[in-house]
Swiss-Prot record:
Pfam family, one: Fer4_NifH
UniProt cofactor note: Binds 1 [4Fe-4S] cluster per dimer.
Family assignment from sequence similarity: Belongs to the NifH/BchL/ChlL family.
Location of ADP-ribosylarginine modifications: 104
Recorded catalytic activity of this chain's protein: N2 + 8 reduced [2Fe-2S]-[ferredoxin] + 16 ATP + 16 H2O = H2 + 8 oxidized [2Fe-2S]-[ferredoxin] + 2 NH4(+) + 16 ADP + 16 phosphate + 6 H(+)
Assigned keywords, A-Z: 4Fe-4S, ADP-ribosylation, ATP-binding, Iron, Iron-sulfur, Metal-binding, Nitrogen fixation, Nucleotide-binding, Oxidoreductase
UniProt name for this protein: Nitrogenase iron protein
Cofactor annotation: [4Fe-4S] cluster
GO BP terms in the entry: nitrogen fixation
Binding-site positions, ATP: 13-20
Protein purpose: The key enzymatic reactions in nitrogen fixation are catalyzed by the nitrogenase complex, which has 2 components: the iron protein and the molybdenum-iron protein.
EC number(s) from the headed UniProt entry: 1.18.6.1
Source organism: Cyanothece sp. (strain PCC 7425 / ATCC 29141)
Amino acid sequence: MSDEKIRQIAFYGKGGIGKSTTSQNTIAAMAEMGQRIMIVGCDPKADSTRLMLHSKAQTTILHLAAERGAVEDLELEEVLLTGFRDVRCVESGGPEPGVGCAGRGIITAINFLEENGAYEDLDFVSYDVLGDVVCGGFAMPIREGKAQEIYIVTSGEMMAMYAANNIARGVLKYAHSGGVRLGGLICNSRKVDRELELIETLAKRLNTQMLHFVPRDNIVQHAELRRMTVNEYAPDSNQANEYRVLAQKIIDNKNLAIPTPITMDELEDLLVEFGILGGEEEYQKAISQDQGKQLTTV
């Protein structure tokens, strides 16, 4: 299969939003449907493949390269492992905290994989990328035109939406030069009031779609404790079917758009409209009450 036919997608999202869990469960469902997939973990935590491999954390390309002296000293079989439903699994890794650029591992890993034929005979390559910041390194799959479809995992919480808007801004920056497009928002529910409606509204403001609303279910945590995807742990569960629906939506998705990020003021107005944030009047009232309490305790 030629590289042109491979769909290269990327999951971005705020740290802690459940991005890696959502992406692995979705990839597992896609693999069940016969799709040939490789996951390239681009998060320094190296947790993008552990549910597929039933392991704590896969040894990363950058870690092995540091041990050997150079990435050229590695063999593909050492870093490319096969997981659930024959999904290929790679973790790029990153430097020690406080030293160097974590994005460097992504650049090194992708170049190594391409040069060693890892992209052959695939339908999808999925990049799992840290998305609190879209700096040069973490934007590499977007900037270099590797990932063509971006899926943002978010929720109805303010910081998750803030990160989603920032990621959309990063996609816009490279949309014309690299051809990258936003495939949609995936709402990983936190049971925020009016969450479905809120994320649908945000998606429209960003000129995209809410691709799927993933309900909150403790079975996800039960599967994670066993280092398994829900599709493997409880294949007949409602949650496994939710991931299958999401997987099919990604496979069928043709709605790839150039995003229209909003300003911070517009995002705050949206949160006020949906009752996530208080308006200026409520803010001033709360501040006055706090000041009153402080005066009475002095």
